[in-house]
């Protein structure tokens, strides 16, 4: 089993990551979340290792990849999906742990550039993908 962790608010993320590791879950993570988990001396895979593509545009693009979204979205009971992910070597992502940027805080600040920077497309996509699999 694998989990993707990408959080803005890292409160207690080390504990959650440790608990997941103790359950035998393989952790995948992005940027600052990856660093926090790594500093807690836990095994974690950096998202770039999964996507085979570096984080670009100051972190704006880091996980938009079939290796991420395909791993979340494929239907585990669909033979066509199973054949596709096997052929493309896409591994399942079974758990998604995210929290969104504080958009309301940015909106209240009124700075248009800050507002745009706080539109969290990546975590919204993870949330949508994971919800599709419920």
Predicted regions and their residues:
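N-terminal glycine-/serine-/threonine-rich phosphate-binding loop
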Residues: 1-27, 33-45
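Short, flexible loop segments at the rims of nucleotide/cofactor-binding pockets, characterized by
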Residues: 4-6, 72-74, 115-116
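Well-ordered alpha-helical segments embedded in enzymatic catalytic cores
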Residues: 12, 122-125
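Short beta-strand scaffold positions
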Residues: 28-29, 121
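Glycine-rich nucleotide/cofactor/substrate-binding loop typically near the N-terminus or early
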Residues: 32-103, 124
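Glycine/threonine-rich flexible loop motifs
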Residues: 103-117
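Internal gly/pro-rich beta-alpha loop/helix module
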Residues: 118-119, 128
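Single conserved hydrophobic/aromatic residue that forms the stacking wall/gate
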Residues: 126-134
């Amino acid at each position: 089993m694998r989990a993707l962790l990408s959080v803005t608010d890292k409160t207690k993320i080390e504990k959650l990551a440790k608990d997941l590791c103790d359950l035998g879950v393989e952790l995948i993570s992005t940027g600052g979340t990856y660093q926090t988990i790594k500093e807690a001396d836990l095994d974690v895979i950096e998202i770039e290792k999964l996507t085979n593509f570096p984080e670009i545009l100051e972190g704006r693009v880091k996980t938009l990849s079939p290796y991420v979204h395909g791993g979340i979205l494929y239907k585990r009971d669909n033979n066509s999906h199973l054949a596709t992910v096997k052929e493309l070597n896409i591994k399942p992502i079974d758990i998604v742990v995210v929290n969104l940027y504080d958009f309301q805080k940015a909106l209240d600040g009124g700075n248009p550039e800050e507002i745009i920077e706080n539109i969290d497309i990546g975590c919204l996509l993870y949330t949508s993908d994971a919800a599709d699999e419920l």
